[in-house]
Amino acid sequence: MKQYLLLAASAFLLQGCQTSKEDIKEQPLKMIEQIDFSHVKINDNFWSPRLSKHVSATLPVCSDQIENQTGRIRNFENAAKGEGEHSGIFFDDSDVYKALEGMAYSLINNPDPELEKKADEWIDKFAAAQQPDGYINTFYTLTGLDKRWTNMDKHEMYCAGHMIEAGVAYYQATGKRKLLDVCIRMADHMMSQFGPGKRHWVPGHELSLIHISEPTRPLY
């Protein structure tokens, strides 16, 4: 009896799970859209203390490392002047961009005029370091622009990707688009270098090109 009931139940479930190709075609596609983080406020008991620690400890340490303990921000200053040596490793620009992205996320839930002022100061340095053709990378600006885009392992696209992530995040957090415009010029420069009949590389941070499409969509 138990075996019969089990068999009958299985048959009933299988029958309910059957879907014809016609049924599948008639079902509307449901698009999943990412929610802009600037529309999200976090105030729960688990994450709020961690976000507070991010503001009070993580960001100050990151800023100190970038401005005082290493030459990362100085690389942008030197690149803007077109003189001086590059300090650190070739992908160090990305660490500055990551820290700025962290500032942007923090400003949503913890507005801080001083933190925003520091972010704006960094962005001014980025913009000053950008080349007339849109290229921005302090390593090659200071070691030889003739060598740019010759070695995929040197993280040029990777650094550009993190800059774009930071630029989009800061625009969403503050409405300020100075860094976003720097990112657009760099993206346009990369489009002039890569594609059919041009260079063929695997991008180092392809998701950033998707993220920049949202705030720039009305422009194209």
Residue ranges and their predicted role:
Residues 93-105, 160-163, 176:
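Conserved beta-strand->loop/alpha-helix structural units within folded catalytic cores of enzymes
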Residues 21-95, 119-139:
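Low-complexity, Ser/Thr/Pro/Gly-enriched N-terminal "stalk/linker" regions
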